[in-house]
Every structure is written in C-alpha cells, then in structure tokens.
A protein has these predicted regions:
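Glycine-rich, small-residue loops and helix-cap segments
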Residues: 48, 163, 167, 180, ...
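Short acidic, glycine/serine/threonine-rich loops at helix termini
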Residues: 9-13, 60-65, 82-84, 93, ...
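Acidic carboxylate-rich catalytic motifs and surrounding loops in phosphoryl-/glycosyl-chemistry enzymes
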Residues: 2-4, 182-190, 335-338
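Short glycine/serine-rich loop segments
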Residues: 1-114, 327-335, 377
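A short helix-breaking turn/cap at a secondary-structure junction
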Residues: 69-170, 176, 183-187, 358-360, ...
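Flexible loop/turn segments at secondary-structure boundaries
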Residues: 5-9, 57-60, 154-158, 189-191, ...
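Charged, often glycine-rich, active-site loop that binds/positions anionic groups
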Residues: 14-19, 192-206, 346-350, 354
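Short, well-ordered beta-to-alpha junction loops that form the rim of enzyme active sites
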Residues: 3, 152, 298-302
Length: 403
C-alpha cells in the first residue's frame, strides 16, 4: 500500500491513514513527493506506468529519487478534470500533469495517445487538441544542438553525486557533437524568494486549513510547526539566519508581506506576484535567446533519496525543481546511474564539499550520507510548449547513459 504526503507540498511520503511509503531501492529512504506513492508503486513493478501532478517538483523529485523517467509539461499542454489546481490565483506557480515511465519512448507513446485524441478532448473539453509534433521529436538526431547547462543554480549547492552526473552528461553530449554552453541563472536568490512566496500566495493559513483537526504524522510535525510560526517571528528568524545560511534565511522570510491587504482581492495578489515574475522571466529568457539555446541541463535535485526524517528540514532543495514551475518551462528527468562510493567520500570531505557554518548545507550532508547505490538523474528544460524538443534531448541523454 502506498500513499501521498498528507496535505501534499512535501516529499516526505506519509499519511496518518496509510503510514509511510518507502523508496523501492531502500526502505530507509523516502520515494519523494508529492506523487511519490505512485512512482514507488511503478518502480516496484506494481503498474506499467504511473501518473502524477507537479506544482514544485512532485513528478520530478520522485522520479529522480526512484530512478524513473518523467516530464512536467507546460501548464495547459496536458489538462485533467476533477483535480485540485494547486495554489489559488492566476499568478500561482504553473501546475503540470504527467507520467512515470521506464524510458523516454514510453513518455512519447503515452503523450501521443492523449494529446492527439478526440476522445480525450471530449472528456476534457477545455483541453485543446495539441498533438506532439513528430518532426520535432527527432531534432536531437537531425542536427547538433546548442545546450546550456549549470552544475549549481547559485541558491542551493547539490551534493557531489548530483553535480557529477551533470558534468558527465555534458561530456557525453559533447562527444556526440552537440555544443554545450555554461549558463548562469540570473539573480537566483531573488528567483528563489519569489518561488517560495508563490507556493503559498495567501500565506501559511491556506495550507494550515488542510491540516486543521487532522492527525499529523510524526514525519510532518516539524513542517506543520514551522507553518504555524507568526510572520513577525519568521521575519526575525530570517534576519538571524542571514548571517548563517542565505538559503534558510530566504525560505524563512519568503512570505507575502502586507498579507491582510493582499487578501482583500485576488487582483492585488496576482499583481504582486506577476510584477516580479515578469522581471525574472525576462532575465532568464533573454539570456536563453542570447546563447540561442535549444535546451538546458541541470541537476535533477540537490540530493538523492534521503532518510524519511529529513524532507521537512530540506525545504531549501525545492528550488531545483520549483524554478521551472515558476517559469512554466517543460522539464523532464532522465536517470543517469547511481551514487558511487567516491560521491559519498567527497561529500564527507570538507575541503572538497565545503559547508562552513551554513546549517542548510550541514543538514544536506547529513541527509545524503551513505547513499551509494541510490538512483541519480539530470533535469532537462526547454522553453514553454517545446515538450517535443525536451523529449528529444532527454532521449539523447538516455542513449548516451545506456551505452
């Protein structure tokens, strides 16, 4: 029996009804979330494919933790009926629906069936007929691509295993003749602040209502406790943490200020988010166009699958996937082997993987210890509505890693 995180918005996959769902590769580790239950079931052989949604990485985190392939489409490319729409308001983070599969070809097979189906259009009338373009699915085979990459996003440093596979993927693609260009994420700390504010545009109250009068699983109690902290106290904590850990400071202080005024009308909320989002979006896309990129490769997540007790303390990691919900870019996960003993050794080496006094990095190191043998992956992103190109690059990466 598998489950999803109670209340969602967590990669601690547990609930008070069904207990804890474990990673198929190690029962001491989480499969991720919030679509972790279906991914774990699929990877364990319980289904031929899995399904899920993705508001901040809920497809991509489980896929990277469990060794599955997935794609978060642009919002609107694949729609569903009778599901929650994520955070309220038109300026919320983009929500995508997708599948867990073993290969990229299986992703293409399932998307072709749905996106070109008149029957599907009848079931979901607000879904336009937007079939996959077969010619664009082979773009990586037909010409050499110009692909951007980054090993660190400038907000949360990934552990050695997660950065290693990006570097190796870049080398493998260069051997095939593709051009790889180092990409610098513009203003990552500001983008991260906007992302964390965007998760809960109405403040913590919206999510706390979900937990009200419910039995809270032990693994989520820290998360719920943090949600209950007064905003003034969060501001003070954020200031103190700014001298110790920038990521923790940003996460602690990223709430919508003047909340009572913002709650008066939805319009004020949307204007607040969209104004700053537009600046980040322009900076990102302008750099993309300057480099004439076809796609972008980066770490799938900052860490492989972690022990069950850690997700509530690793909220700083969510930006790795949430960035592409903020931008509404299609983003996919491709498995790239497993963590090795050298990765574990380098993680423990302070001279190589420096943490200093940064609490966030110290927690990350503790969470990632002894991960040898666990799946690791890379993430591929393209501009909005270029799912075909994203899938094509994913297939190219899959090919070089399976040689």
């Amino acid at each position: 029996m598998t489950t999803v995180p109670q209340g969602l918005l967590s990669f601690a996959c547990c609930s008070s009804l069904y207990g804890i769902t474990s990673n198929p590769h190690s029962h001491s580790r989480t499969p991720g979330g919030s679509s972790g239950g279906d991914c774990a079931l699929f990877v364990a052989g319980g289904s031929t494919f899995g399904t899920g949604s993705d508001l901040a990485g809920s497809l991509r985190i489980p896929a990277s933790f469990c060794g599955a392939t997935t794609l978060k489409p642009t919002e609107g490319r694949l729609r569903t009926n009778y599901t929650l729409n994520g955070c309220s308001g038109k300026a919320r983070l983009s929500l995508g629906y997708g599948f867990f599969t073993k290969t990229v070809d299986e992703q293409i097979f399932l998307l072709k069936i749905l996106l070109g189906s008149a029957e599907y259009h009848e079931l979901v009338p607000h879904q336009p007929l937007f079939p996959l373009n077969g010619n664009k699915l082979t773009v990586a085979n037909s010409r050499h691509l110009r692909i951007g990459y980054f090993v660190e996003d400038g907000f949360m440093k990934p552990v050695p295993a997660c950065s290693r596979v990006v570097v190796q993927t870049v080398e493998k693609l260069r051997e095939l003749g593709h051009e790889l260009v180092l990409f610098h994420l513009p203003d990552p700390e500001h983008a991260a602040s906007l992302f964390y504010r965007g998760i809960l545009p109405y403040g913590r109250e919206q999510l706390l209502q979900i937990y009200a009068n419910e039995v809270i699983p032990p693994l989520l109690r820290t998360f719920v406790f943090l949600l209950k902290l007064p905003l003034l106290l969060c501001s003070i904590i954020s200031y103190v943490l700014s001298f110790i850990s920038t990521p923790l400071s940003i996460v602690s202080g990223s709430y919508i200020r003047n909340l009572q005024d913002l709650q008066i009308t939805q319009k004020l909320t949307d204007q607040y988010i969209e104004k700053e989002f537009f600046i980040i979006y322009l900076q990102f896309t302008e750099q993309w166009k300057t480099f004439e990129l076809d796609a972008l490769i980066c770490p799938a997540f900052a860490v492989p699958a972690v022990p069950h007790a850690y997700p509530s303390r690793l909220g700083t990691c969510a930006f790795a996937t949430g960035l592409f919900n903020l931008l509404d870019f299609p983003a996919g996960i491709v498995p790239t082997g497993t963590v090795n003993s050298d990765d574990d050794r380098l993680l423990a080496d302070e001279a190589f993987w420096h943490t200093g006094i940064d609490f966030a990095l110290k927690i990350l190191r503790d969470a990632a210890r002894d991960s040898a043998g666990l799946p690791v992956a890379v993430q591929v992103a393209t501009l909005p509505l270029e799912e075909e190109k994203c899938l094509s690059v994913m297939k190219e990466i899959e090919k070089v890693w399976r040689k």
